[in-house]
Amino acid sequence: MFAIIKNGSKQFRVFEGQEIFVEKISLMEKSNYEFKEILAIGGKNNILGQPFVSGAKVQAQIIKHGRAKKIIVFKYKSKKKYRCKQGHRQNYTKLLITKIIA
């Protein structure tokens, strides 16, 4: 069985036992988190939400918080000696999907 969940502006297709990386969630490690915005449930009988599936939820456990690899943003204007270099590291949360309730 799988579910398609919405977290912020992103959608994830998840299975039980799967680990996913999402935008930072402000909860402690080893605590439980519950997704309530379920767009679809798949398996033996498929359920599509309009826009969400009523009564469905996905339970997950927070494994760890971290920061992604640094990306470099470099802007310049040719022939004008304008150079701007900036780095950015995005915060993330690693989740373990424990249960899908349809």
Swiss-Prot record:
Superkingdom of this protein's organism: Bacteria
GO BP: translation
An example molecular function term from Gene Ontology annotations: structural constituent of ribosome
Keywords in alphabetical order: Ribonucleoprotein, Ribosomal protein, RNA-binding, rRNA-binding
A GO term from the CC aspect: ribosome
InterPro entries, per database record: bL21-like, bL21-like_sf, Ribosomal_bL21, Ribosomal_bL21_CS
A Pfam family matched in the record: Ribosomal_L21p
NCBIfam families: L21 (TIGR00061)
Subunit structure: Part of the 50S ribosomal subunit. Contacts protein L20.
Chain's role: This protein binds to 23S rRNA in the presence of protein L20.
Family from the record: Belongs to the bacterial ribosomal protein bL21 family.
Protein name in UniProt: Large ribosomal subunit protein bL21
Taxonomic lineage from the root: Bacteria, Bacillati, Mycoplasmatota, Mollicutes, Acholeplasmatales
